[in-house]
Amino acid sequence: MEVFNIKIGFGANEVTLTILPMDEGYYKVIYYGGILGAVRLDNDHMTWEKVPDDEIEAGDLPFYRHDLSADRLDVVLDEHTVHQIGEEIHA
């Protein structure tokens, strides 16, 4: 699979994320040029889960740094956001 973009609702806003499929079976979630995290289907292939940060191979990209003073939404990969991302990946 190739890199693609998705849009998800985040609060009252909509956020565009870049999704980078990995050979290891997970999808890196890129936001403003940094790795926000990664998602994958759990063992039963029914539910999406967040990949622990120490299991993500960063490669050439830095991890995203949260900055509350920046002029952008501070997206957090909570359970709801992970589910939305997974639904968009399979849409």
Predicted segments, located by residue:
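Short, low-complexity Ser/Thr-rich regulatory SLiMs
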Residues: P21, R40-N43
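Short hydrophobic/aromatic-rich beta-strand segments that constitute the beta-sheet cores
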Residues: K28-V29, K50
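Negatively charged, low-complexity tracts enriched in Asp/Glu with abundant Ser/Thr
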Residues: M1-Y27
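Acidic, low-complexity intrinsically disordered segments
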Residues: N43-A91
